[in-house]
Amino acid sequence: MAIQTTTGLAARLVAKRATFPASRRNFSASRSALKEIQEAYILSGARTPTAKFNGSFVSVSAPELGAVAIKSAVSKSGVPVEKITDVYMGNVLQGAVGQAPARQASMFAGLSPTVESMTVNKVCASGLKAVALAAQNIQLGLAEAQVAGGMENMSRVPYYLPRSTQLPPFGEIKLQDGLIQDGLWDVYNQFHMGICAEKTAKKYEISREEQDQYAIQSYQRAQAAWKENKFAEEIAPVTVKGKKGETVVERDEGYENLRIDKMATLKPAFLRDGTGTVTAGNASTMNDGASALVLGSKAIAREFAQGNRALARIVSTADAAIDPVDFPVAPAKAVPIALERAGITKDQVAVWEFNEAFAAVIKANEKILGLQNARVNPLGGAISLGHALGSSGSRILVTLLHQLQPGEYGVAAICNGGGAATAMVVQKLDRVD
């Protein structure tokens, strides 16, 4: 048998390619193959109430919560379900959740089995990143309508036990807390995320008093917002089945847990050497909840979304990475990129929604970006409303959209463990021409 040399094979391939028209090649550079980037719009948004850790949603899985948010968002959008081709849902703590959490949420929401689904894990930024990914499909002309959001049930995260081959032949066995292992632990430095917040507070000279005062403000704003019914349009009630029948959960559960007289007396949660400033009071809580948005092309928005309360144009998105220990200030890297891509300045932004992982996160980013006098988290944030990891990014976006007035710009930004952040600029609309 003759041996074919590489040179001979290459010569024949070149000759064959010469007879293959450029217009039929997969990677054609012809102008006819290029497509213009399209606009992506948000048609609706909804979120479940955010429940306390071991609270009302302890028996409801993350995908089931996600399904409630998806079903509500789709209903509000007016978009026929047959137009939706993809679902992107953030979910961080996937131990014992079951295969393909986003697929579960899509199916439980009643979407067609032909709808493709993808689960996104960018830690706290998962929900907002899911929206960015869905928007890209529309911008590239690959889809007409998408669903995106996030979901988490921190109450149901299991403890981990290594397989038998990794266990000692005798003696004690130690369980790992899945909540800490996969959600709250800095893998690179081997300490709690709260230590990162402590280092940020020290670096940017943010005192314990400043952090406590910000936390009190967050609770007071959330309480005022609920009193004034400002969350009514975004909430999707959750029906929870129990031994005594069904209970409908319609309100966030933690925002009333403020005792101003106790705030200053709380002990530091992470540094106990006398220098700690981060406490359970000025940090976000552990929670369960979900949020979802429906995105569409210009044609879809024009046909189905006129007058929708959450109608908005996605102007730009951005991600940025930083040293893992500095993750709290990663939004200060992502936001300028998003603003530059949007072609606007920070002074043109009407409302900012930053995730309140810790009070130190907000104070540091305000200081770096010069937002001390801006409208940042006017209705409270994760400290008072809760931080259900995979949902938080899309939750702040849903809340942002329901605050903006037509024509106004808003920015949602969220840091994530590992040293990164995602930011998004949106513009509120009342119609699409």
From Swiss-Prot:
UniProt-listed Enzyme Commission number(s): 2.3.1.9
GO molecular function annotations of the record: acetyl-CoA C-acetyltransferase activity; metal ion binding
**Annotated Gene3D superfamilies:** 3.40.47.10
What the record says about disrupting the gene is: Leads to lethality.
Active site: which residues? 124, 387, 415
Q: Where is the transit peptide?
A: 1-34
Q: Which domain of life is it from?
A: Eukaryota
Localization in the cell: Mitochondrion
Outline what the protein does: Mitochondrial acetyl-CoA acetyltransferase that catalyzes both the formation and degradation of acetoacetyl-CoA. Has no overlapping function with erg10B and seems not to be involved in ergosterol biosynthesis. Plays an important role in growth, morphogenesis and maintaining mitochondrial function including the response to oxidative stresses.
Q: How does it assemble?
A: Homotetramer.
Q: Which family does it belong to?
A: Belongs to the thiolase-like superfamily. Thiolase family.
Protein name, per record: Acetyl-CoA acetyltransferase erg10A, mitochondrial
Name the gene behind this protein: erg10A
